[in-house]
């Protein structure tokens, strides 16, 4: 499979989608709420994606919970990460949440949810209650449980947004945030611990500039991705860029320049979402390359949604998540 992830417009593939999915540079499709009507339609779409690609291809979605849950009707509601630490049995619930989220996606032939968020703190507009907590131990304890749940059902895990997006106020979807702190050791401690525990299969860096360390956003910085992530922390998994269509990546130039910089800096795979012209421009200008190691991220199990829903574990987890949402929703 190639390094580029892109999106498709609707419930079914167009002729253009089918043609693009055969391009050797394409390695993944990221789905959005607009791609989901009901359970059977989603299964049919994912089957069509795999057939059109004619080779292994990754299918992913942002389904972490709370406001970032693309598939809702017909799926269990997953709470924002912040809620787990507020509950008495929060660690147990976080593991159930990770398992439930991953299991329901696998039952619909989705390989990945880009989760969990390992950022610390609730102040950032882009993160807010997507974070598990405001201190290292709270984030570590609850994210570790969520990761255990995902792995138990056979979904690869993605830590984000390295080396920490939680301390900036600005939203990297809309602008490039600058983290002016002289040290981000506390934020880094979370990523370091999860890498050492061997529970992260992939990593997604932040479109954030940390000027005391490097002038480039982490997503396009060889300092962060090669020197720190690979060499210092010893991370061996896949590195995804965050969506290169986000304004946070604009300092790296146009679509081709952003893609080239991210790949040269150390990203293995790059995402270009909601801008088909930009994705095609990148396909036309990037040299063809393979990312065979990314096949390790394909889902590890196969089962139907009806089989899943018959499990007592599913019934219990789904009910518990709904109760948690009702308990803490404002």
UniProtKB/Swiss-Prot annotation:
It catalyses: Hydrolysis of terminal non-reducing N-acetyl-D-hexosamine residues in N-acetyl-beta-D-hexosaminides. GO terms for biological process: carbohydrate metabolic process; cell division; cell wall organization; peptidoglycan biosynthetic process; peptidoglycan turnover; regulation of cell shape; response to antibiotic. Substrate binds at residues 62, 70, 130, 160-161. Its main location: cytoplasm. Keywords: Antibiotic resistance, Cell cycle, Cell division, Cell shape, Cell wall biogenesis/degradation, Cytoplasm, Glycosidase, Hydrolase, Peptidoglycan synthesis. Its EC number is 3.2.1.52. The record marks 171 as: Important for catalytic activity. InterPro entries: Beta_hexosaminidase_bac (IPR022956), Glyco_hydro_3_AS (IPR019800), Glyco_hydro_3_N (IPR001764), Glyco_hydro_3_N_sf (IPR036962), Glycoside_hydrolase_SF (IPR017853), NagZ_Beta-hexosaminidase (IPR050226). Pfam families: Glyco_hydro_3. Belongs to the glycosyl hydrolase 3 family. NagZ subfamily. Plays a role in peptidoglycan recycling by cleaving the terminal beta-1,4-linked N-acetylglucosamine (GlcNAc) from peptide-linked peptidoglycan fragments, giving rise to free GlcNAc, anhydro-N-acetylmuramic acid and anhydro-N-acetylmuramic acid-linked peptides. Plays a role in beta-lactam antibiotic resistance via its role in generating anhydro-N-acetylmuramic acid-linked peptides; these peptides function as signaling molecules that induce high-level expression of the beta-lactamase AmpC. Monomer. This is Beta-hexosaminidase. The gene is nagZ.
């Amino acid at each position: 499979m190639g390094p580029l992830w892109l999106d498709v417009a609707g419930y079914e593939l167009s002729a253009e989608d089918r043609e693009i999915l055969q391009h050797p540079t394409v390695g993944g499709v990221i789905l959005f709420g607009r791609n989901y009507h009901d359970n059977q339609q989603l299964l049919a779409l994912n089957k069509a994606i795999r057939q059109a690609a004619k080779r292994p291809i990754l299918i992913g979605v942002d389904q972490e919970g709370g406001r970032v849950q693309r598939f809702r009707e017909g799926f269990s509601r997953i709470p924002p990460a912040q809620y787990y630490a507020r509950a008495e049995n929060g660690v147990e619930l976080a593991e159930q949440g990770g398992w439930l989220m991953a299991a329901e996606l696998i039952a619909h032939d989705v390989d990945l949810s880009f989760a969990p968020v390992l950022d610390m703190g609730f102040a950032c507009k882009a993160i807010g209650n997507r974070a598990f907590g405001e201190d290292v131990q709270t984030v570590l304890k609850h994210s570790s449980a969520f990761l255990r749940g995902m792995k138990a059902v056979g979904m690869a895990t993605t830590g984000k947004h390295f080396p920490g997006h939680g301390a900036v106020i600005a939203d990297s979807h809309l602008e490039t945030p600058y983290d002016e702190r002289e040290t981000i050791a506390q934020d880094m401690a979370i990523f370091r611990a999860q890498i050492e525990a061997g529970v992260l299969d992939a990593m997604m860096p932040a479109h954030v500039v940390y000027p005391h360390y490097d002038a480039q956003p982490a997503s396009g910085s060889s300092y962060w991705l090669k020197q720190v992530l690979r060499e210092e922390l010893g991370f061996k998994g896949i590195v995804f860029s965050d969506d290169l269509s986000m304004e946070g990546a604009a300092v790296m130039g146009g679509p081709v320049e952003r893609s080239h910089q991210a790949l040269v800096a150390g990203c293995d795979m790059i995402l270009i979402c909601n801008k088909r012209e930009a994705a095609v421009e990148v396909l036309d200008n990037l040299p063809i390359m393979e990312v065979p190691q990314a096949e390790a991220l394909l889902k590890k199990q196969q089962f139907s949604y009806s089989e899943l829903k018959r499990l007592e574990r599913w019934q219990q987890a789904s009910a518990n998540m709904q109760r948690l949402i009702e308990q803490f929703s404002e």
